[in-house]
A protein has these predicted regions:
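Juxtamembrane helix-capping/reentrant segments at transmembrane boundaries
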Residues: 42-56, 111-124, 294, 299
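Alpha-helical transmembrane segments
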Residues: 2-33, 63-101, 132, 137-138, ...
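Membrane-interface loops
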Residues: 29-46
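Hydrophobic transmembrane alpha-helix segments characteristic of membrane transport
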Residues: 102-110
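Short aromatic-rich membrane-water interface segments that cap or initiate transmembrane helices
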Residues: 53-55, 148-159
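Membrane-interface helix termini and inter-helical loops of multi-pass transporters
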Residues: 2, 78-81, 108-109, 140-152
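Internal, non-catalytic "lid/hinge" segments that mediate substrate recognition, gating
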Residues: 116-117, 127-141
Length: 329
């Protein structure tokens, strides 16, 4: 396919994702307010966040629904092919969105932040990850970790299933942990998906690239409502879906190592939580003022918008490195 035609498809994909999210946001946010689907704010995050109490959650639907509908439209109109890989991605995206939606719904029903228990959520995530692994292997998926230019070829055999499960569950929870400031997780996800869109197209996964361009456009549309001051939060509905599909795209395009670079900010946020727990148990004191890391900066007196801008810039720089790594290495 010519580069110009591919570019046209990519631009169109971003546009329909963006417009779909903007329109749905206009309709959905008032409906969520009417239904009193408001986020309850933890007492531990400080007074700056208390004013956000009651902001509608489940806003992930604003980018999930347009992404699914636009992708189906592109398939029906034969602009992209419904390959097994794309089908798997859609199932993962929808499945993890459902887990998040269920968690958000139960949190609202109980009138606290306790939706699904940690075990329930983890079991559902693992169940979908196992389904992903089954479909991946049935479709002739490789079980080796490969970075061709560096001469890395590690045959993992059955252990690749554990590795895959770790990527999917880990990525979904990493985005979930990062979703603590207005626009933070949404902006970082949009930046990461731009990278995976370009990488997918360049290495021959056109249908995955177009899907991620649609999702990128929808995230830009969502950010109109989620950037500071947020009119809506994505909730677990959005964060779990974003992380899982990011992991799925990395696996299906054989860019698992690239994911570590492109999603470095998410990784750092998650590591800050792990290190904090380790430090508390080992040395009986905190390593950070508060985790995830963005809350540490808040405790240092940084403004919310300044933290988000810093994290976006770091994410953008690392994503550019990730594109180079993902295409040429």
């Amino acid at each position: 396919m010519s580069g110009m035609l591919l570019l046209t498809k990519a631009v169109f994909a971003i546009m329909i994702g963006f417009l779909g999210a903007v329109v749905l946001g206009l309709l959905l946010i008032p409906a969520l307010k009417k239904l009193k689907v408001g986020q309850r704010i933890s007492i531990f995050v400080g007074d700056n966040h208390k004013k956000k109490e009651g902001t509608p959650t489940m806003g992930g639907l604003i980018f999930i629904i347009p992404t699914l509908l636009a992708t189906l439209l592109l398939i029906v109109t034969k602009k992209i092919e419904l390959t097994t890989n794309l089908g798997i991605i859609l199932l993962v995206f929808t499945g993890y969105a459902f887990i998040g939606f269920l968690d958000d719904y139960l949190s609202l029903k109980k009138k606290n932040n306790e939706g699904l228990t940690t075990i329930q959520k983890l079991l559902l995530q693992v169940l979908i990850a196992l389904g992903f692994f089954y479909l991946y292997m049935k479709n002739g998926g490789q079980t080796a970790l490969i970075v061709s230019t560096l001469g890395i070829h590690i045959e993992m055999s059955w252990f690749y299933g554990v590795f895959l499960l770790f990527i999917l569950v880990g990525a979904s929870n990493a985005v979930n942990l990062t979703d603590g400031l207005d626009g933070l997780a949404g902006g970082l996800s949009a930046i990461a998906f731009i990278a995976f869109s370009l990488i997918s197209l360049m290495v021959g996964f056109e249908e995955i690239g177009i899907f991620t361009f649609v999702l990128t456009g929808a995230l830009f549309g969502f950010l109109i409502y989620n950037a500071y001051p947020a009119k809506v939060f994505m909730g677990d509905t959005g964060s779990l879906a974003l992380g899982a599909v990011m992991g799925a795209v990395a696996i299906l395009t054989h860019r698992e190592v690239t994911l570590l670079v492109v999603a470095s900010v998410f990784v750092i946020e998650t590591l800050s939580v792990i290190l904090q727990v380790f430090w508390l148990f080992t040395f009986k004191k905190k390593l950070f003022l508060m985790t995830p890391l963005h809350h540490h900066f808040e405790k240092l007196g940084w403004g919310e918008q300044d933290i988000v801008k810093l994290f976006w810039v770091v994410g953008l720089i690392l994503t550019m490195a990730g594109i180079f790594f993902g295409v040429w290495l």
